[in-house]
């Protein structure tokens, strides 16, 4: 049976989402068309608006509709001498929910992965280095994921910090090896922050 080109395009477009294969995309498309057209229209509007209006914070690189995000724009945060480096914006959300950190952030938007062509510049380490030189941080907390790539990224950043005599630590126990911050519960993440250790 020949299907509608518009339907095929919808199914194919839904496959761009992580973990969504052909069957899942097809189920989603049929659900929206059969049972939830208003939800589909709301989704389309929200996607269009988000894609056109959400950019990156000029200071920390997280997602925001403004030039500077609400965390970086907070006067209490601006005086903090603690900088937490994370891989993704979702990691900030996870850390903020613990209430254990009141410093500033820097988002890498990934991790070092030479085999995939992702080097220091691709994850903004040149911007991080400039920020470390321009601002007076007492400590940099590395909250990269406990993966091989996360470890390599943390070690690289630790070297940058050591060159500038900035104390550097990494969140420690509680996060499973191979896990990702955005999926860890708040209690575990709290223990990880309290148990961070110095590197170098």
UniProtKB/Swiss-Prot annotation:
Keyword RNA-binding included in the entry's annotation: no
Q: Where is the Toprim domain?
A: 81-176
Q: Which family does it belong to?
A: Belongs to the RecR family.
Stretches annotated zinc finger (C4-type): 57-72
The molecule here is called Recombination protein RecR
Q: What are the protein's GO molecular function terms?
A: DNA binding; zinc ion binding
Output the PANTHER family linked to this UniProt entry.
Answer: RECOMBINATION PROTEIN RECR
InterPro entries membership: DNA_Rcmb_RecR, Rcmb_RecR, Rcmb_RecR_Znf, TOPRIM_dom, TOPRIM_RecR
The UniProt keyword set, sorted, is: DNA damage, DNA recombination, DNA repair, Metal-binding, Zinc, Zinc-finger
* Record carries keyword DNA repair: yes
What NCBIfam families is this protein classified in? recR
From the UniProt record, give one GO term of the biological process aspect: DNA recombination
Function, in words: May play a role in DNA repair. It seems to be involved in an RecBC-independent recombinational process of DNA repair. It may act with RecF and RecO.
Identify the species of origin: Mannheimia succiniciproducens (strain KCTC 0769BP / MBEL55E)
Listed CDD domains: TOPRIM_recR
Q: Which SMART domains match?
A: TOPRIM (SM00493)
Pfam short name (any one): RecR_HhH
């Amino acid at each position: 049976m020949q299907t509608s080109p518009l339907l095929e395009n919808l199914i194919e477009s839904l496959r761009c989402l992580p973990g969504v294969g052909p069957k899942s995309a097809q189920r989603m498309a049929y659900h929206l068309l059969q049972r939830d057209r208003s939800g589909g229209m709301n989704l389309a509007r929200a996607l269009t608006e988000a894609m056109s209006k959400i950019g990156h914070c000029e200071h920390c690189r997280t997602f925001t509709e403004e030039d500077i995000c609400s965390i970086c724009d907070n006067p209490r945060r601006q005086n903090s001498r603690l900088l937490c480096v994370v891989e993704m914006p979702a990691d900030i959300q996870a850390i903020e929910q613990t209430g254990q950190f009141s410093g500033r952030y820097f988002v890498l938007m990934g991790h070092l992965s030479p085999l995939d062509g992702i080097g220091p510049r691709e994850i903004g380490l040149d911007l991080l280095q400039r920020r470390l030189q321009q601002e007076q941080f007492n400590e940099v907390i590395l909250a990269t994921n406990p993966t091989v790539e996360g470890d390599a990224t943390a070690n690289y950043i630790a070297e940058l910090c050591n060159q500038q005599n900035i104390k550097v630590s990494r969140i420690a126990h509680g996060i499973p090896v191979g896990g990702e911050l955005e999926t860890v519960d708040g209690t575990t993440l709290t223990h990880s922050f309290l148990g961070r250790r110095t590197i170098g």
